[in-house]
Amino acid sequence: MVRESIPKEGENIKIQSYKHDGKIHRVWSETTILKGTDHVVIGGNDHTLVTESDGRTWITREPAIVYFHSEYWFNVICMFREDGIYYYCNLSSPFVCDEEALKYIDYDLDIKVYPNGKYHLLDEDEYEQHMNQMNYPHDIDIILRRNVDILQQWIEQKKGPFAPDFIKVWKDRYKKIRQY
């Protein structure tokens, strides 16, 4: 059943990541919604329980702001560490929401961005392996490659979640909501 409305500010939701074959990949138990629109969901979490597909669990180490967009095939996790802000970008389907969680399909490719602005494309071998195993359609491959380019442009241009004011605004908003 589809959620009738977008997640509301202050609401706590789960985030569920799937693989192309429909199997659950990873679940974040709780993320606080900072902004929810038809196109963008921004959330915050800290020391959140994460459950892997094999049942293993772990807890995130630092506060993070998460960014999802309904028109782009990626999502971004901004992690606040002692030595600066790190970004972990997942190439994924656009998000959908229902009563259970915010959901997306993880397509293996990732970009890690360091505090100095340098970045690396990760997991290309895993992507090739899963593309063959799960029969990713050629159209999906084209879309994902195009979104890698878009994401790299955003990183280089400090656009969207990579903009310095984005970090300040949403980190402050998360702190404020957590105080209530």
Curated annotation (Swiss-Prot):
The active site is at residue 26. GO terms for molecular function: magnesium ion binding; nucleoside diphosphate phosphatase activity; ribonucleoside triphosphate phosphatase activity. It is an enzyme of class 3 (hydrolase). Mg(2+) 1 binds at residues 90, 106, 110. Mg(2+) 2 binds at residues 108, 110, 123, 126. It comes from the Bacteria. Its cofactor is Mg(2+). InterPro entries: DUF402 (IPR007295), FomD-like_sf (IPR035930), Ntdp-like (IPR050212), SA1684 (IPR016882). It catalyses: a ribonucleoside 5'-triphosphate + H2O = a ribonucleoside 5'-diphosphate + phosphate + H(+); a ribonucleoside 5'-diphosphate + H2O = a ribonucleoside 5'-phosphate + phosphate + H(+). Its EC number is 3.6.1.15, 3.6.1.6. Keywords: Hydrolase, Magnesium, Metal-binding. Belongs to the Ntdp family. Has nucleoside phosphatase activity towards nucleoside triphosphates and nucleoside diphosphates. This is Nucleoside triphosphate/diphosphate phosphatase.
